[in-house]
Amino acid sequence: ESYSLNHISHVVLGDEKLDYSDVGTFMETYENDHQRFIDYHIKDVELVHRIDEKLGLIDLVMTMAYMAGVNYNDTLGTTAIWDCIIYRELMSKKIAVPQPKDHKKAAFVGGYVKDPHVGMHDWVMSFDLNSLYPNIIIQYNMSPETLIRMPNAIGAKAANGATFRKDKVGIIPELVEKLYVTRVSTKQEMLKVKQQIEDEGKSDSLVRKATILENKQMATKILLNSLYGAMGNRYFRYFDLLVAEGVTTTGQAVIQHAEKAVNGFLNKAMQDDKDRVIAMDTDSLYVGVGDLVDKYCKEDPVQFLDRFAKEAIEPILEKSFEQFAKDTDAYTNRMVMKREAIADRGIWTAKKRYILNVHNNEGVQYAEPKIKVMGIEAVKSSTPEVCRDAMKQMFKIIISGDERKTQDAIAEFKDYFKSLSADKVAFPRGVSDITSYADRNHIFSKGTPIHSRGALLYNYYVKKKQLDKRYRLIQNGDKIKFIYLNKRNEMQQNVISFPDDKLPDELGLNKYIDYDLQFQKTFLDPLDIILKSIKWQAEPVANLEDFFV
């Protein structure tokens, strides 16, 4: 949602940065309360240290670096780290490392994303293909040295027609297999510890153990997933367009094959031809089974669906993937699709945008359902924090299926929103280059983005009112906030930006904040996308019958 230290500290630690607002500005704190200024920086360092103690992020980087044999900085990229991994493997086998080549820039297809069934759905199960792209590489033995560059070649065939040798294992598939085995065993151990935490409650030792295992499996996952990013990069030593495109096109074929298998099985079970796959995203299926629950099990749907997924759908998928591998003459069958989430309700607004009320995830049963949000404004750092928090609460009400309660909650939050200061309700943004938009005669030039326009106005009026010694000016690269104004203000402008701590009172703009427009833009517009998808209104709509009540 936000990468600010204050937000991360609040979420991870339940703590925040030291507040100095009672002293004044940051510069005034330095001049008038130097001890507070020192304490502020000490607290920042303590927060960073505590976050790392809890999340083990430095451990994650070190784990990746040691696994790959690279410097710590190289773990942040994809090509350098895999270049080193493959280099070490080739050296161990006494195989000469090929020289890098120049490759022309070329676009190729990505993952398949289905147009979702927009709206609200009861009882949704998600199924996820285990490490799709890495397993495709293994399944078709995809490696530059195994690619057969002859027409009508015999071998393992990717969906784009690329054919690979089956008489020897490629270097890249061999490396992927080693990493994959490590990740699977680590993840299984991690899930056991997480279930233990759910059953027994949190303890420092269990949380720490779960974090260590999470970091180890995450390091392996990052390495596995970054391989495809490297293989699709024309600057990678082992780049080959046929191989890179073979991975994605085969991924598309596999996920659509899975959709057909699931729909076919459920159609047969329910004796209809309904499309129950609500959405698909590269390696995931979201299946609506509300009618199945209504027909067969209303008392304990979560347990029923857990069993149904294991004993019915997963075997069907396994059988279909075996046939797919046979049809494409694969080197081996590596496709495994397991049930991930069980949710009693889900809402889709568009591709990759949904809300799920999850009861069980990968076999971990939650004491209380957890809301999973993907692609919705509430999880974007460009939305004010107060609106993100309110939207999460709103999702819980919406998921309950009560339109009137949702409308009441919106009205209540709007009243609270209007009582807040500018820094709480303003849009968080970053400005990369405000100087290029400056205009000596008109402050800003035509076509200036709204947040940059607000920044130039702020700088102009802070200097005009001789406040620049008290308040710092906005510079290129700064994190700022901007807010809408009524045009009746001194500037006769509809926006002002300010550094992310406070809008100076001396500018006299607080009384001109357009709270209605700000509420509409920051909260109601994003929420309305969800409400429209389920045909709800944000406010009660009067009709003729209400007149006679």
Regions found by a protein language model. Name each.
Residues 1-45:
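Active-site-proximal helix-loop-helix substrate-binding element of RNase H-like nuclease domains
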Residues 9, 44, 48, 183, ...:
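A residue-level signal for conserved active-site and pocket-lining positions in enzyme catalytic cores
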Residues 17-27, 100-107, 157-158, 191-194, ...:
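Active-site-adjacent bridging/hinge elements
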Residues 22-31, 162-163, 231-239, 286-295:
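A short small-residue
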Residues 36-51, 178, 182-185, 250-257, ...:
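A non-catalytic, amphipathic alpha-helix used as a structural packing/dimerization or gating element
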Residues 52, 62-140, 144-149, 154, ...:
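DNA-dependent DNA polymerase catalytic subunits
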Residues 150-168, 175-177:
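Conserved phosphoryl-transfer catalytic core
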Residues 168-236:
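Active-site cores of enzymes that catalyze phosphoryl transfer or operate on phosphate-rich substrates
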